[in-house]
Curated annotation (Swiss-Prot):
It holds the Pfam family DUF1054. Belongs to the UPF0637 family. HAMAP family: UPF0637. This is UPF0637 protein LMHCC_1566. It comes from the Bacteria. SUPFAM superfamilies: YktB/PF0168-like.
Length: 204
């Protein structure tokens, strides 16, 4: 498909009641966009990193009763899976779109990565003021990257078994960067460029 951007309808899809109905909306309306966006960004990241990257689209197969509150694509160096590795995400809650560099609870290097980020403060200090962080990919709550929550979020990621750390940028449904498609791709590439130094540091 030709990607024309994200619309308010995509956010409303994440409000559809019921697991089956919401998953149908996600599969029909959102996942084709994820496929188109993801293929472009995977190619972009592969070239930027000099390492083949692979696209994964969340399938929510563990869901049996409650519909997913968010849905996403992930880009990772591992073709078989992304959750235990540092990876990039583009996804939706019902009230914002996110572009994250994600370290979720399955990551087996959380202590090493958190300590590196805590020690090498410049890596995160150089991020734009418009960026945000999240301590939990399942929750909508985010914090501006420079508002004082960074240290506590990294320490929780390091010390708590289910701790997570996500960093990137969020967009409200009426944000002009979401469409047309070429504008969103350009914006996403700019965000990824800011996150690549963190990604590289996390792999060292």
């Amino acid at each position: 498909m030709t990607f024309k951007g994200f619309s308010k309808k995509d956010f409303k899809t994440m409000q559809i009641p019921g697991l089956e109905a919401r998953m149908s909306g996600i599969q029909t309306d959102i996942q084709p966009k994820f496929r188109a966006v993801g293929e472009e960004l995977t190619t972009y990241l592969s070239a930027k990193l000099g390492d083949e990257m692979f696209l994964h689209i969340a399938r929510h197969q563990r869901r049996s009763v409650n519909p997913p509150e968010s849905t996403w694509l992930a880009i990772c160096h591992d073709k078989r899976g992304y959750k235990k590795h540092p990876h990039f995400q583009v996804g939706l809650f019902d009230n914002y779109l996110f572009i994250w560099l994600a370290f979720i609870y399955e990551n087996e290097e959380s202590k090493k990565i958190a300590n590196r980020f805590l020690k090498e403060k410049k890596l995160l200090a150089d991020l734009p003021d418009s960026f945000a962080i999240s301590p939990d990919h399942t929750e909508e709550k985010t914090y501006p990257v420079h508002d004082g929550q960074l240290k506590a979020t990294l320490e929780r990621f390091r010390d708590v078994k289910k701790g997570e750390f996500l960093v990137g940028k969020i967009y409200l449904p009426d944000d002009s960067h979401l469409s047309p498609g070429k504008d969103f791709i350009k914006e996403a590439e700019m965000v990824l460029d800011e996150l690549i130094p963190l990604y590289k540091a996390s792999l060292q």
